[in-house]
A protein has these predicted regions:
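Conserved Switch II/interswitch segment of TRAFAC-class P-loop GTPases
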Residues: 40-45, 72-82, 93-155, 168-181, ...
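Glycine-rich, flexible loop/turn motifs
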Residues: 23-31, 38-40, 48-51, 80, ...
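Conserved G1/Walker A P-loop phosphate-binding module
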Residues: 1-111, 139-140, 145
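C-terminal-of-GTPase-core extension/linker across diverse P-loop GTPases
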Residues: 2-6, 17, 144-350, 362-363
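Structural motif
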Residues: 352-357
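Amphipathic alpha-helical transducer elements in NTP-driven molecular machines
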Residues: 32, 46-49, 62-68, 82-96, ...
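A ubiquitous short alpha-helical element
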Residues: 56, 126-130, 238
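Conserved metal-binding segment of the jelly-roll/cupin
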Residues: 70, 359-360
């Protein structure tokens, strides 16, 4: 699963990408310093793995991972191919969710592509380009569906949904703001609309706003805008995050304490991104390895077993499950079993985040 980091030139998105991935994507104070998207594979922070590692002392600990793609800065006219626009839009099509970085700080030394700091204008600039691209996509699908309607009346339902979406897009709103039924979503699932992708907004703030980001009027504006899309906003100072990313262990902990934070803003971004993708983790624990496995929310036990090995899914008998909280409270799997806290679940069991599992199977 991939998240695309987007933003206008010079808002801090490549610096954030560098900090998240430590991949050293080229970063400079001029537009288009990222042309081909840089891709970084990032471990998802999970304190539960640290606790299990203390209990099992495993040979290795493996985190769940997600991919971030740093997509070059979009500009007005991208949907018409301006500013390498076609390339940018094709890169956005390839990601599952969007992380949009907006600038919420003043600094005369960092140029803004539009000459002034206005995060709502920046959001609109990008969203309108995505909306224009979606209108073009919807029009093509409508033409096709109307031709097919002559031979098969079932296409009327698809036409109805597409026209409903087009109306909202033409009002300058994203497709994700529309309430659609599961049936309607199914009808347009192959339309791949850019503004249907889930979105997370990153408000890049100054160091002086770290203690109380809510006092920043620009952040408030972004939060108000995001409400309509049921989107989350994470304020963070990307400059400070870059410093934090260069530190390890105690040094990082000391700096976090000095600025009054429990965890880095980037850790919050990664966790929120994982959730945005509709993902969660189940855990396996033993002396060889403590590991988090990525699954979609709503996944049943046999499908989760298949993440480990296809043979386990094929020969699934049952899943022996204990919750993370119960295991930590009791101190060992033996104690948890004695208390009756280890459950036996069958094929219809829907996995929960943090389930610690041993799959029984036979092939």
């Amino acid at each position: 699963m991939k998240l695309g980091i987007v933003g206008l030139p010079n808002v801090g998105k490549s610096t954030m990408f560098n900090s998240i991935t430590k991949a050293g994507a080229e970063c400079a104070n001029y537009p288009f310093c990222t042309i081909e998207p840089n891709v970084g594979v990032v471990p998802v922070p999970d304190e539960r793995l640290d606790e299990l590692a203390k209990m099992y002392n495993p040979e290795k600990v493996t985190h769940a991972i997600i991919e971030f793609v740093d997509i070059a800065g979009l500009v007005k006219g991208a949907s018409k191919g301006e500013g390498l626009g076609n390339k940018f839009l094709s890169h956005i099509r390839e990601v599952d969710s969007i992380v949009q970085v907006v600038r919420c700080f003043e600094d005369p030394n960092i140029v803004h592509v539009d000459g002034s700091v206005n995060p709502l204008r920046d959001i609109e600039t990008i969203n309108l380009e995505l909306i224009f691209a979606d209108i073009e996509t919807v029009d093509k699908r409508l033409d096709r569906a109307k031709k097919m309607l002559k031979a098969d009346k079932k296409y009327q339902a698809e036409i109805d949904v597409l026209e409903k979406i087009k109306k909202v897009l033409e009002e300058g709103k994203s497709a994700r703001t529309i309430e659609l039924s599961d049936e309607e979503k199914d009808l347009i699932k192959e339309t791949y609309l850019l503004t249907m992708k889930p979105i997370l907004y990153i408000a890049n703030i100054s160091e002086s706003d770290i203690e109380n980001p809510k006092s920043n009027e620009l952040v408030k504006q972004v939060e108000e805008y995001a409400k309509a899309e049921k989107a989350q906003v994470i304020p963070l100072c990307i400059k400070i995050e870059e410093e934090l990313a260069s530190l390890d262990g105690e040094d990082k902990k000391e700096m976090l304490e000095a600025i009054g934070l429990k965890e880095s803003g980037l850790d919050r971004v990664i966790k929120a991104s994982y959730d945005l993708l509709g993902l969660m983790s189940f855990l396996t624990a033993g002396e060889p390895e403590v590991r988090a496995w990525t699954i979609k929310k709503g996944t049943k036990a046999p499908e989760a077993a298949g993440k480990i090995h296809s043979d386990i899914e094929r020969g699934f008998i049952r899943a022996e499950i204990v919750s993370f909280d119960d295991l930590i409270k009791e101190g060992s799997m033996v104690a948890a079993k004695e208390k009756g806290l280890v459950r036996s679940e069958g094929k219809e069991y829907i996995m929960k985040d943090g389930d610690i599992v041993l799959f029984r199977f036979n092939v």
